[in-house]
């Protein structure tokens, strides 16, 4: 085997493994999967069960195109969170958020989902229309998800509900908006 092949074959194999991990090869959610997720959610003891937001989430499921997407998060931290069991007395909002992320990081990474952008906000919103109380944010974070299936597998795990309470207490308000993935930022093409 010549020297060039000894270099290229491992590189190609590594890229193919990365591509298979990073790409949703399962296609869009099927009706059966959606019904299974709905059943899991309805049978759960989740505090989120009565939230009208779940109708929007199920609509998001049913419109699945099988592609990856970004979740844009605006976070306003709670400066005086109540005491929570796992983080103890005197825990800051960051402590609570990190307890939540201890579950999220490994769940996201094993599904080729990861942070894309994270920054502290410099100033209150400079342009805001038709809403009150949305001027102030502390953090903007963008996460890439390989698929909607991955998002719902993470979010419907019973451990998620336990940890999600910590995220809720860590924040005064938050908005999470799914958006299309910009083509130019796709790591499969950058590599």
Located regions from the model:
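An acidic-aromatic pocket/loop used at catalytic or ligand-binding sites
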Residues: 146, 150, 188-191
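Active-site scaffold segments
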Residues: 139-144
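Catalytic cores of eukaryotic secretory-pathway lumenal/extracellular enzymes that build
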Residues: 171-172, 176
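Short amphipathic alpha-helices within nucleic acid-binding modules
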Residues: 83-84, 147-156, 160
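Short S/T/G/P-rich N-terminal loop/turn motif that feeds into the first structured element of a domain
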Residues: 2-137, 180-191
């Amino acid at each position: 085997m010549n020297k060039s092949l000894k270099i290229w074959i491992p590189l190609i194999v590594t890229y193919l493994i990365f591509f298979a991990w990073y790409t949703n090869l399962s296609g869009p959610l099927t009706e059966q999967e959606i019904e299974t997720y709905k059943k899991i959610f309805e049978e759960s003891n989740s505090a989120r069960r009565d939230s009208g937001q779940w109708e929007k989430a199920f609509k998001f499921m049913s419109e699945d195109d099988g592609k990856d997407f970004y979740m844009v998060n605006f976070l306003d931290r709670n400066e005086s969170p109540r005491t929570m069991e796992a983080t103890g007395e005197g825990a800051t909002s960051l402590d609570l958020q990190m307890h939540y992320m201890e579950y999220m990081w490994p769940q996201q990474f094993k599904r080729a989902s990861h942070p894309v952008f994270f920054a502290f906000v410099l100033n209150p919103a400079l342009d805001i229309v038709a809403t009150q109380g949305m001027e102030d944010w502390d953090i903007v974070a963008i996460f890439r998800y390989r698929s909607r299936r991955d998002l719902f597998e993470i979010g419907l795990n019973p451990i998620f509900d336990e940890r999600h309470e910590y995220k809720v207490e860590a924040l005064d308000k938050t908005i999470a908006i799914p958006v299309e993935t910009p083509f130019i930022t796709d790591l499969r093409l950058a590599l």
